[in-house]
Amino acid sequence: MSLNLSAEEQTAFDQLFKIADKQDIGVITGEEAVPFLEKSGLAPQVLGQIWQIADAENRGFLTFSGFVIAMRLVALAQEKLPFDYKKSGKIPYFADIHISGVDSSKFVQLNRPNNVSSGDGSDGSFLPPISSDEMTRYQQMFTTVCPTDGLMDGDRASSIFGRAPLSTEILARVWNLVDTHKRGALDIREFNTGMHIINLLLNGSLKSPPVSISPSFIASAASTSSVSAPSQYPGLSRSPPVQAPNIPVSDPWAIPSQDLTSFCQLFSNVDKAHKGYVSGSEAYSFFLASKLPEDVLAQIWDLSDTNSNGKLNIGEFCISLYLIKLKLSGKELPKVLPSSMLSSVAPLMQKSKSVPTSIPSVVPANISSPNPNPTLAPNPTGPSRVTSGTEDLLSLDATPFSPTLAPQHTSSNATKHSAPPVTKSAPFPVVSPLQLNHTPGFPTSPAAKPNSPTSTFFPQSSFGQTIAKNTMDKPSAVRTSVPSQLAAPIPQVASAEQLKLAAEVPKLESQLSQVKKSNDDLQKSSRDVAANLSDVKAKVSEIRKAYDEELAKAKQISLDIETNKAQTEQVNREYSILEATLNALQKQNKQKGEVLEQVVAESEAAKNMVESSNASIQQLKSEVADKEQTLAQLHLQLDEMTQRLVSLDEESKAVSQRKLDLEYKINNSKTQLATATEEYHEHSKQLEAEKQELSKLEDGLKSVNLTEEAPKPEVDSTPRFPSFTSNGITTDKPTLPDTTSSVPTQHNSFDAMHNTLRSPSLNSNNSSAHASTVSRNPFHNLKISGASSPVSNFWESEFASAVFPRSISKTTSLSVNNSSVNPSLDSEPVQLSNMEEPQHQDSSVVDVSTSASQRGSPVLSDLSKLTGSARNTAEPVENTSAEPIENTSAPTPFEIANKQQATEPISAPFATETISTPAPVKPPVPPSRRDRSAQDGVVQQATPHIQDEFPPIQFNEIDDDESSSDEEPPMSNLSPQISIGSVTNYTSAVTELPDPNHQLEMSTTTHVQHPNSETIPSSTENQYFDTTSGAFEANSNTEVTVNSNEVSQPFDFDTANESDNDDDELPVQQVVSGSLANDAFNVDDEFDNQFANLQAAEIKDDDNSSTDEEEHAGHH
């Protein structure tokens, strides 16, 4: 019966069948089915009903079709539905079994059965009851091991229990539980209980053996021990299965002992009649369950049937099952059975010989039978049909049989011969009705009917033909042996017996008459049967012919059906592929249509966006143009406001600087005023003393009569008189001889005071006390070169640009008298006023005049205050304009000399070389911090001074001879011009500096032009600040030309030190080449000459040189 399975059922049942078929032989035996079905949680009675329905043929095992029926019945029982297994339903639930690939909703929702013990209880009531199948199986095992007595000793029980794959500890606990009498042996109840516990442990129903078992459970384990097996296992209690011997396996073809035990159990299930062998019909259905081809099964049958008798005993059955197992595992079958395989089943073959086989017994016919003339009915014939392989196998035991009874011949002389009648010849043995009933394949009607026409059956399958060949060859021996038994001569009867027989003659005669009558009836019936037989033969031949034709047609139809099935399957596959392709194409077309619609919509949206974007762009362009125009206007306004802010800022800075200047001047003036006051008091005291001495000398002169005039003493032709400026600074103002007056020079004692008030000379005798010590003059580290040096001129320019921070015009000239420089000038600020550019501005020689004053000994203006001489007290008015203001006071001898010198050309060794410095000008830098590139003709940028190293020098203006003003004249009105013997013209724009410390942060970039006409460009963005307008103006770059011969002259330190310690004093007035100005300062003339000829010395100062290099790299 074929059942239509769903996909879920097919998947689930395949997995469950593989789990239940532990031996992997293609069928599920009763031993394997019991523990498997118990996991469903159903009662044993329900499982027994399910087994009877699934195993309808009562074969003792389940094929896959029977297993499917059992699974559906289990699912229906779990859902408590009627047993209708023809309809598909849910998948049954089995404890501890997981099935993959099936939805959980397809399973029966059933919890774990409660009747299965977990092994944790201490009472035996937790153990499930022993099913009848298990009880029968356990009883067979017990009776096999103990056939006589009712006890199983420990060795035999341990050998059986030890076959379970459990630990020794668990088996010992099981033994202690079931050995209730502690006698070292088990009866059938205890043995069944122990086997049941072991089975529960193996299938997972119990995790561990229980603590104790109730006596009632053990007593119920043997309640069915004397009852025969249930209907599905007929005859198991009558014939226990043969146990497989324990044969060591050393050869791959030898059958293992475990397999032999399993095969013997299967043999007992298949051999339901316990004949000791398995017929072809019984083996055929069992072998087909392995799903092997029929030709392979036929080969296995040929190898297993060692006796070629068409049936398999227990040893041959084990061989066939082992060969099936090897073939299923993928191994090839041997051509001939190996000796190791035969030796492994040899004990089973010997035991099978002692089992009687069912051979039909031959008995003589009973002559005195009350029914001597049985009626023979012909075998009915039906329509021909196609036989299957199973029918071929089932018909092997139905041997062709056509019994005929020969007529009996008795002695005519009944009185002389009294012997039982016998048949003379019989072609087939007479079989008893009992034997016929036990012969499979015979009809239920009487078989011993003579003249019964039968036809010989020829099986169609190769497997059936192989078995039929072996079976058809055997009955010939039996048929040939029967006549020999019937033809045996009857032994002679003794005389006594003859007398007895003679007494029975009348009786026998009467019987003879009856027999004759019966013979006549039989002959008549025989003739009738012969006539019927000819008719039947004719009909049989016709039917045989029709059968063969129909058989050929059936085969052809079968072939056509198979071909059509193959074609139909191919067409169905192609149809499935085409249908899937069509669905895929339709789906793709639909998707592409949707994408096309979406793309079209997006394209339309993009076009609209482009149009709106173009309109927005045009609008934005117009707005951008308006914004740009507005922005340009705003930029113009911003530039204008920026310029205004810059102007205001510069003006603010100028005012702040002016304020700081004034505060600084006020502080200096206060300090100088205090110093001058002290000096004034000292001079007053000295003057009083001198007056007293003078009065004494005058008194002495009056008393002395001079007869002749005293020689004229040699005094300084340029007497110096102390003078106090308006800010309290004392200055030395030379008094030049008046060429227009013939007033003789007065000789008084003020010259001594004047000499006393002079500053100590570098070469005077007053400094001899310090000759042995190291000079602290920073200029002693410089070397002296020739009469004139560009370095000295550069110092003059540096000091002029640093100490005169204000610039009225773009060009300011400064020339320092080399004979009036004092080291004390380094600590005083210098002021420089603007001068008008002379008419010969384009020439290389520019006349400069000076109006600076140096604090020192009293000058003429101060002396005039002391002596009470008249001075010009007119205060000059400060002029803030850019134009220079002329001095309204009378010209001084300095100015007269300078004006005369301005008209004459200057002849100097390097008068043709011009040094120009762009604005802004920064404070002076000592030679030790200058770059060493001066030897190459380039004056590098000076590094800033450290604080208080070289403070700026301040020069106060020189008052006029007739002036006695107490206030400082405005800086814009000063126009100092001093003529120097070797003059170098400097043209620079000076920037007003906020304070002395801030002046050190400024720097001056000087461009020097080498005699070889190598031009070095100056900074491209030099600017100077105009104090009158408060704005910066760009200064054009100029070139500076320096005589490299003069620059390269070394400085003589030895000469400088010797001249520093010299006691001789230079005269106050000194004439230099060209036009020389008078010395207005109280300093040494020799130092002035040295200062004019200074040259930078090569001094290795790592710190200063690194600073110079960094600053030089920053500017370049």
Swiss-Prot record:
Is Glycoprotein among this UniProt entry's keywords? Answer: no
**GO molecular function terms noted in the UniProt entry:** calcium ion binding
- Organism for this UniProt entry: Schizosaccharomyces pombe (strain 972 / ATCC 24843)
* PANTHER family listed in its UniProt record: DYNAMIN ASSOCIATED PROTEIN 160, ISOFORM D, EH DOMAIN
- InterPro entries cross-referenced by the UniProt entry: EF-hand-dom_pair, EF_Hand_1_Ca_BS, EF_hand_dom, EH_dom
Coiled-coil stretches: 565-707
Record keyword Repeat present: yes
Subcellular location as annotated: Cytoplasm, Cytoskeleton
Q: Which PROSITE patterns match?
A: EF_HAND_1, EF_HAND_2, EH
Name this protein carries in UniProt: Uncharacterized calcium-binding protein C800.10c
Q: Which residues form the EH domain?
A: 9-106, 134-224, 259-348
**Biased composition, class Low complexity, residue ranges:** 755-774, 812-827
Annotated Ca(2+) binding lies at 305, 307, 309, 311, 316
Query: Where would I find the EF-hand domain in this sequence?
Result: 8-43, 42-77, 166-201, 292-327
- Composition skew (Acidic residues), residue ranges: 957-969, 1055-1066, 1104-1116
Sequence ranges of Polar residues compositional bias: 401-416, 723-749, 864-890
What is an example of a Pfam family matching this protein?
EH
